[in-house]
Amino acid sequence: MAPVVQQPAPSFKKTAVVDGVFEEVTLEQYKGKWVLLAFIPLAFTFVCPSEIIAYSEAVKKFAEKDAQVLFASTDSEYTWLAWTNVARKDGGIGKVDFPVLADTNHSLSRDYGVLIEEEGVALRGIFLIDPKGVLRQITINDLPVGRSVEESLRLLEAFQFTEKYGEVCPANWHPGDETIKPSPEASKEYFNKVNK
């Protein structure tokens, strides 16, 4: 069964490349933190390195928000390691500042509902998991289009805001923007401000 927002995220234990070495990584080790789990189809391709590099360059922004970034593919840990040893200018990913998970048996991709069975690769899924291990947001792209780091950060900040303050975030919300008190009467305050 595919994962569902508001339900516990599927647990996992996978071998990952972390700072150039192999380590076992589990979802449970990040309990108490936000987790952004992203899937890519294949190493040594075209859109995939652009995404990994973009998220790696923004990893400090995620860390400042108490969020751990993880990437996964159906490639082996050896493929991931080889890819980190190729310079970015040559299509590699170089040093990556988050764990990259090897899903060689496809269980992780299947559990998260992104596996294209006949091809043995994952769709471009992003899963935002809260500190309790509950799925809060799912986005799945078809293979040819990469994801936006800015949108991932915006969604993380919006969910964190709603958790902290109990208000809800309207379309295109960014930190500092007006929010909505979730009741028919109180919400009028927001709508009166933005719809003059």
From Swiss-Prot:
Which E.C. number(s) belong to this protein? 1.11.1.24
Catalytic site: C48
According to the UniProt record, where is the region Disordered? 173-196
Tell me what turns on expression of this protein.
Induced by oxidative stress.
Q: Its catalytic activity?
A: a hydroperoxide + [thioredoxin]-dithiol = an alcohol + [thioredoxin]-disulfide + H2O
Can you supply one Gene Ontology CC term for this chain's record? cytoplasm
Q: Which CDD domains match?
A: PRX_Typ2cys
Thioredoxin domain residues are 3-161
Biological processes, Gene Ontology terms: biological process involved in interaction with host; cell redox homeostasis; cellular response to hydrogen peroxide; cellular response to oxidative stress; filamentous growth; filamentous growth of a population of unicellular organisms in response to chemical stimulus; filamentous growth of a population of unicellular organisms in response to starvation; fungal-type cell wall organization
Question: In terms of one coarse class, where is the protein primarily found?
Answer: other
Task: Say which domain of life the source belongs to.
Answer: Eukaryota
Q: Which Pfam families match?
A: 1-cysPrx_C, AhpC-TSA
Consequences of knocking out this gene: Results in delayed hyphal development and enhanced sensitivity to cell wall-perturbing agents, yet does not impair virulence in vivo.
Q: Which PROSITE patterns match?
A: THIOREDOXIN_2
Compartment(s): Cell surface; Nucleus; Cytoplasm
- Basic and acidic residues bias: start-end ranges: 175-196
Residue numbers binding substrate: T45, F46, V47, R124
Listed GO MF terms? high molecular weight kininogen binding; thioredoxin peroxidase activity
Keyword line: Antioxidant, Cytoplasm, Disulfide bond, Nucleus, Oxidoreductase, Peroxidase, Redox-active center
Other known facts: The active site is a conserved redox-active cysteine residue, the peroxidatic cysteine (C(P)), which makes the nucleophilic attack on the peroxide substrate. The peroxide oxidizes the C(P)-SH to cysteine sulfenic acid (C(P)-SOH), which then reacts with another cysteine residue, the resolving cysteine (C(R)), to form a disulfide bridge. The disulfide is subsequently reduced by an appropriate electron donor to complete the catalytic cycle. In this typical 2-Cys peroxiredoxin, C(R) is provided by the other dimeric subunit to form an intersubunit disulfide.
Subunit (UniProt): Homodimer; disulfide-linked, upon oxidation.
Task of the protein: Thiol-specific peroxidase that catalyzes the reduction of hydrogen peroxide and organic hydroperoxides to water and alcohols, respectively. Plays a role in cell protection against oxidative stress by detoxifying peroxides and as sensor of hydrogen peroxide-mediated signaling events. Also involved in the correct composition of the hyphal cell wall.
**Assigned protein family:** Belongs to the peroxiredoxin family. AhpC/Prx1 subfamily.
Record-given protein name:
Peroxiredoxin TSA1-A
Q: Which organism is it from?
A: Candida albicans (strain SC5314 / ATCC MYA-2876)
